[in-house]
Amino acid sequence: MQHTIKNVSETEQQLEIILSAEEFNPEVELEIQDAKKNIQIKGFRKGHVPVGLIKKLMGPAIEASVAEKLASKYFGEIAEKETIKPASRAQLDNFSFNDDQLTITLSYEIHPEFELKDFSGYSFVEDLYTVSDEDVQNEINLILKGHGTLVSVDEAATSNDTVIADLIKLDAEGKEIEEQKTENHHFNLEYLPEDNPFKKALTGAKAEETVNVDIEPKEEGEEKVSYEISVKEVKRMELPELTDELLKEITQEKFDSIDAFTQDVRQQLEEHFSGKSEQDLLESISSKLIEENPVATPSAMVDSFENMLIENAKRQFGGNFPAGFDDTELRASMRPNAVKHAQWMLISQKIAETNNLEVTDEDIKAYAEKEAEKNPSVKAEELINTYMSTEFKDYMIDTILKDKIYGIIKSSVTIQGENKAIPKHNHR
């Protein structure tokens, strides 16, 4: 067997395999014998069709089958010998038989070879969130809202109120467009951005007042859009008093002490924002390394990440897009993000390879024991058995390897903490 590897691009190769008659004839004979057992031709008993007739009728199909099987067999052997890192399945481009040899041509994508830039001089900022008493109370108020009551107030609307109003669109001359009138629209000001023109206009407005809103064009060629809004009612959320009885109802009797509940809310906030801080830091690190190492990406790898992003989007619609939805534009918009995912995978693999990182069974056990410490209701032995199972082990190896990769990076770069307040509207 002879073979020649040709580099087509940074991520593509073509492989030519030349096999002698001694190497491919046994497979041809097997295919002929298999066909002989199954083929049925009028005038011949099953299993007794002459070989010459089988070759005449099924020659091209037999040759194609032999080429595919031998291509698969020898590609695996060559990939191992030549340390090829395939990023896609090898495609059979062409094959040709003659009396003496079989020539097979395959194409496939590979993981690109590249040198990772030294990242030890990089600096990053890590947000350090401090949970205040006010933050805890705001979170409790969010929980209490589910049991609160919207009441009408004869006051100017605040930025947290709900304004009920009729709005009508105006034409360029300021005249009402009757067919574009909406009655009893609810403006939940609390959830509108600070720079939203409706929020700006309605904050401070009272019932029976009229305000005008102008929405300036975002792009050249677009026209200004104007509305007249007639305020009918201002409603404000009235929160109930947090009593022991209400606490039991809200928490399904998990807590019977307001102090314990408050402490739990604080702990949940601290854990959430600690996780957010870590995730934001890791995203900054990956973005910087991708920017400094714009590695070429195999299209099959990018396709895989694109499909993953599409599936995530489908889940937001309950598992499937609406009937008739064309995801072409969505895929196009997600493609750059999929490329970055692929680039980060290649960079991560390079860091793991350079530092000889691997995940052992002991690593998985240690991870399980650490997780069990966070949740006393779960026994470490049970977690170990779960994580070591066939269903979970690959996932755990991937998770722990990622931690090790980030550990290598974080130990090499400079990370400076920066105190930061928790966002005002924290809807976790």
Curated annotation (Swiss-Prot):
<dbReference type="GO" id="GO:0005737">
    <property type="term" value="C:cytoplasm"/>
</dbReference>
<dbReference type="InterPro" id="IPR046357">
    <property type="entry name" value="PPIase_dom_sf"/>
</dbReference>
<dbReference type="GO" id="GO:0003755">
    <property type="term" value="F:peptidyl-prolyl cis-trans isomerase activity"/>
</dbReference>
<dbReference type="InterPro" id="IPR005215">
    <property type="entry name" value="Trig_fac"/>
</dbReference>
<dbReference type="Pfam" id="PF05698">
    <property type="entry name" value="Trigger_C"/>
</dbReference>
<dbReference type="Pfam" id="PF05697">
    <property type="entry name" value="Trigger_N"/>
</dbReference>
<dbReference type="InterPro" id="IPR036611">
    <property type="entry name" value="Trigger_fac_ribosome-bd_sf"/>
</dbReference>
<comment type="function">
    <text>Involved in protein export. Acts as a chaperone by maintaining the newly synthesized protein in an open conformation. Functions as a peptidyl-prolyl cis-trans isomerase.</text>
</comment>
<keyword id="KW-0132">Cell division</keyword>
<keyword id="KW-0413">Isomerase</keyword>
<dbReference type="InterPro" id="IPR027304">
    <property type="entry name" value="Trigger_fact/SurA_dom_sf"/>
</dbReference>
<feature type="domain" description="PPIase FKBP-type">
    <location>
        <begin position="165"/>
        <end position="240"/>
    </location>
</feature>
<dbReference type="InterPro" id="IPR008881">
    <property type="entry name" value="Trigger_fac_ribosome-bd_bac"/>
</dbReference>
<keyword id="KW-0963">Cytoplasm</keyword>
<dbReference type="InterPro" id="IPR008880">
    <property type="entry name" value="Trigger_fac_C"/>
</dbReference>
<comment type="similarity">
    <text>Belongs to the FKBP-type PPIase family. Tig subfamily.</text>
</comment>
<dbReference type="InterPro" id="IPR037041">
    <property type="entry name" value="Trigger_fac_C_sf"/>
</dbReference>
<keyword id="KW-0143">Chaperone</keyword>
<protein>
    <recommendedName>
        <fullName>Trigger factor</fullName>
        <ecNumber>5.2.1.8</ecNumber>
    </recommendedName>
</protein>
<dbReference type="GO" id="GO:0015031">
    <property type="term" value="P:protein transport"/>
</dbReference>
<dbReference type="GO" id="GO:0006457">
    <property type="term" value="P:protein folding"/>
</dbReference>
<keyword id="KW-0697">Rotamase</keyword>
<keyword id="KW-0131">Cell cycle</keyword>
<dbReference type="GO" id="GO:0051301">
    <property type="term" value="P:cell division"/>
</dbReference>
